[in-house]
UniProtKB/Swiss-Prot annotation:
Protein's organism: Oceanobacillus iheyensis (strain DSM 14371 / CIP 107618 / JCM 11309 / KCTC 3954 / HTE831)
Annotated GO MF terms: ATP binding; UMP kinase activity
EC number of this enzyme: 2.7.4.22
Residues annotated for UMP binding in this entry: G54, D74, T135, G136, N137, P138, Y139, F140, S141, T142
GO biological process: 'de novo' CTP biosynthetic process; UDP biosynthetic process
Protein name: Uridylate kinase
Gene (UniProt): pyrH
Amino acid sequence: MTTARYNRVVLKLSGEALSGDQGYGIDPKVIQSISKQVKEVADLGVEVAIVVGGGNIWRGKVGSEMGMDRASADYMGMLATIMNSLALQDGLETIDVETRVQTSIEMRQVAEPYIRRKAIRHLEKKRVVIFAAGTGNPYFSTDTTAALRAAEIEAEVILMAKNNVDGVYTDDPKLNKSAKKYESLTYLEMLNEGLGVMDSTASSLCMDNNIPLIVFSIMEEGNIKRVVQGETIGTTIRGK
């Protein structure tokens, strides 16, 4: 069996990735595909934690722009991530991958509350852990959640899976055909160039805690496994 480069990873999924071509909601075929890819990685013995966004259902920023109270809009976004997390848990357990959902906002009838040491214990037992409801606080993105949880559980890398791009480019490759893809970057370069991979709070957390980030496309089957095994795909961001 081919060995993995990493022992413990955080997989960051955007909510949009779960909607597939329909652009909204949850596409069962996408859930099946992602679940299969996560299983491939778990079967290598890698400990997998997942943070999923909620943009396929609701974005707090959009609600705020509509005139809603920003905190209320963000809490709605957190609830959307829980819906996505439960769908992904179901997809994983359908193919016999033992999975736990932990939420930053307590709802014990639905999932476990987030407890760092319990999450680590689940990972050590080779269960997949899905962190839902963001950080539990408004004004913080799920990218920041991924960075925070990665630091807390001492993950070796954050795998940022994208559904519409295969790495980080100098410009939007859909609008600018001459845009070049970066193979590697530092966090400072990413921030200074305004590349918009993740927000500055998340970037600073990763940089300060020396957590590398790999941005890649999830649309090609097997890509998560390839990244975990050390293949050079996408863009790697690290250090200062």
